[in-house]
Amino acid sequence: MGTNRGLTLHQRPIITNEDFIQTWHIPEGICDGILEYFENNEKLRMNGVCIEEGKGGVIEKDAKESTDISISPSNMNQPFMDYRIELQKCLNEYIKIYPHINLMNKFDIVESYNIQHYPVGGGFKVEHCERDGTFSKNIKRCLVFMTYLND
């Protein structure tokens, strides 16, 4: 396990086909702030939806059972400003590992993202990919982030 600038990179077993997946820890205080935001903003919560081409977002509990709050990339309220700073640190470390991606376009968070709570037995129960429903836009996406806040 190596460390860089306060970030901890968790080394995974060596694999024969590079999958470009890396993991880092986001500081506990930032994660706690996101959880607190979710808990304190009940009016923003909604049932999780599945995005289907031609239908948009539909609630299908057999496919996905969650409670979500959608966060706009322009939401610079606490704790999301600190979270984005940490994501940028992770991206900077990722670029050091895979420098060829820095030759491509600049990276930024352009899609809304979700804070999702899955009840016991809930979750995404079918195969899916992470996308925002604008199917053609995501064809060229080359980096996805997920932050798990469970203990």
Question: What residue ranges belong to the model's regions?
Answer:
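Fe(II)/2-oxoglutarate oxygenase catalytic core
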Residues: 1-151
